[in-house]
């Protein structure tokens, strides 16, 4: 049985990971990534386009499935001695989708005035329903949600 996760990062950082086929969370920490397993569904939420800016992007910016082959997170090279922990991801072809139209339908936000609370953790588990709803909003292939079920 697969799990589903939302990771949080600026869109600029997400795009780099999407282009290179990996994910990293919480400034490269290993512990959160140990909860994520091959076959799990991943969605990235980006509050901003660029880290530190307040442009109000608030959108889902990538969706995919953790690749099989490496059972544990590994360290990647970013330069300057920074070696963050990562997991490889098969990113789906999808469009960015704003979160606001989904707030009343997502299990983790529905009926909550402080809907951004969970997003502060950087990585948290979501329901199958939420993953499918986000995938649909992003125009991701239907096989993505089916492949992780």
Curated annotation (Swiss-Prot):
InterPro entries: EVE_domain, PUA-like_sf, UPF0310
SUPFAM superfamilies named in the record: PUA domain-like (SSF88697)
Similarity comment text for this entry: Belongs to the UPF0310 family.
HAMAP family: UPF0310 (MF_00771)
The protein's name in its UniProt record: UPF0310 protein msl3206
Organism: Mesorhizobium japonicum (strain LMG 29417 / CECT 9101 / MAFF 303099) (Mesorhizobium loti (strain MAFF 303099))
């Amino acid at each position: 049985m697969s799990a589903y996760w939302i990771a949080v990062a600026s869109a600029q950082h997400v795009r780099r990971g999407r282009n290179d086929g990996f994910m990293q969370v919480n400034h490269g920490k290993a512990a959160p990534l140990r909860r994520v397993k091959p076959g799990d569904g991943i969605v990235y939420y980006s509050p901003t386009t660029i880290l530190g800016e307040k442009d109000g992007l608030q959108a889902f910016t990538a969706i995919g499935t953790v690749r099989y082959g490496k059972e544990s997170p590994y360290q990647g090279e970013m330069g300057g001695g920074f070696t963050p922990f990562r997991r490889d991801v098969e990113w789906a072809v999808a469009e960015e989708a704003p979160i606001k139209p989904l707030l009343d339908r997502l299990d983790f936000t529905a009926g909550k005035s402080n809907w951004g609370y969970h997003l502060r953790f950087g990585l948290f588990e979501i329901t199958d329903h939420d993953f499918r709803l986000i995938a649909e909003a992003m125009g991701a292939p239907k096989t993505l949600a089916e492949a992780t079920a």
